[in-house]
Amino acid sequence: MAFGDLLEKVGSAGPFQLLCVLLLTAPALLIASHNLVQNFSAISPEHQCRPPPPGTNASWVGNSTAAPGGLSLAPSPERCCRLAGTHGQRPRRNGSLGREGETEPCRDGWYYDCSTFSSTIVTEWDLVCDLGPLPALAQMLFMAGVLLGALLFGVFSDRFGRRVILLCSLLLVAVMGTGAALSSDFLTYCAFRLLSGVGLSGFLLNYICLSLEWVPTKSRALVVTWLSYCSTAGQVVLAGLAYSIRDWRWLQLAISTPFFIFFLCVWWIPESARWLIVNHRPATALSNLQRVARINQKQLGGDSISLEMVEKVGGSLPEKSTCSCLGLFHTPAMRRISCCLMSVSFSTNLAYFGLSMDLPAFGLDIFLVQTFFGAIDILAKMACTLALSYFGRRAIQASSLILAGVFLLGNIPVPREMLMVRLALVVLGKGCLAASSVCSCLYGGELFPTAVRQTGTGFTTVMARLGGMVAPAVLVAGQQFPFLPLVIFGVAPVVSGIAACFLPEMHNVPLLDTIEEVEDRARRKGEETPARETVAHVVHSTRI
């Protein structure tokens, strides 16, 4: 008897499974809010030096632009210096003055344009001028927390269980996200953001895993697709929340405090019976299965399961793999698969988060841009899901990356005045990157053999998190070299798309179990299409 037989006895697609997925849908909708909240909470508004005490600088009198709260912003191009003299002469663009005055740093702080947001971390802690890169540092630390969480909670989940780690992750996001909203200084804020990233990563690793282990094989694709679309739709949810809440502290609270409720709701979901059986806890597994049977109104089926049956299923489940990570690079075929997939994961996340974190660069309403980004991601994922069944994995993976790079590189020569053209190219590029992420998740799971599947997936996940960490640094460099972000975000997907052409096709191909089988497949001449033919096919597809 297999575990699937036990699940059928207690109900594999009943009210319990529906409630389980619905309870995990709500927190999934706020994943994007935590990833991208700094698009709004760390926005840098127009700003200008505060003047010296009254009577010492006449240059702030007259011909000024009114700001909320009775403040006045003089229309000067200078943001990080002010006149030191009293003769009313404005600094030139190069920072120098005429004979009548000199410039000095903004010693009394800044005035900010609060017409869009009443408060951000930038306006509260004066993160402008020399401190301008610090918001990007906070985002990098958050992504570092996501990476750290992936390294820690993957191991902890296998050792302590899906449910325990999921609950701890939800509580960590709730507490640390709330702490970030109540932070009194920037360093404290960064620390809370890093730890909330750790918690969010733990949730990401376990919420799909726990739900999948309670549903039958035939329903797994549907569950994964639904939860994936919910997390993508969270970008639109974030736009709505940010539009309604213009103070960064209240916005941070709005996306964090619901996780206390999610923690209480998810407490109802029992531990995965499959995990309990694998870890030699058949009695608890039996209790959970019978509880599911009661909820699904399959009491007779639950009562028919005995402890001996559960123990017998435990003996039939596969043992944990003892292959080390060196198996990913030990043979030529595995090296090619591992390196290509790591490149794909890194470049996809690098460009995806780089575009997602740079909303003000488009010169349009940031709430509208965020909504467009969320909508195109949903459409792209739907299109990719359908295309994978007809055109295969390799062509879709390579085409989506190369097209993304072409759209982004094509944006470079477009004049800045053509805002809608620039936005359209970026939205299309981001949609291709969303399709690439869907394809890589499926493709990676199929390419790695069972012996190293979890290890290989873990390595590609780490590379994806590294890409997300590097993206804010590229945007900071773009402040000095404006063309650099689009060049990097465009070239990286093209290079990875070409690398994807060297991967074997897995459409309608049985999954392999050992590294030796992977090498045997690579040696069989008829199994692989030459890479140059795949490149030609991809180029033809992009032209179409």
Label the predicted regions.
Residues 2-17, 71-133, 294-357, 361, ...:
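Flexible cytoplasmic loops linking transmembrane helices in multi-pass membrane transporters
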Residues 32, 36, 193, 207, ...:
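C-terminal transmembrane bundle
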Residues 43-101, 105-108, 215, 222, ...:
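Central mid-sequence intracellular linker of multi-pass
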Residues 125, 183-186, 190-229, 240:
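Cytoplasmic helix-loop-helix junction between adjacent transmembrane helices
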Residues 134, 168, 219-226, 452-459:
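Cytoplasmic loop-to-transmembrane helix junctions
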Residues 161, 182-187, 199, 245, ...:
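Helix-breaking motifs and short loop linkers at transmembrane-helix boundaries and internal kinks
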Residues 164-178, 187, 228-229, 396-410:
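Structural signature of the two symmetry-related core transmembrane helices
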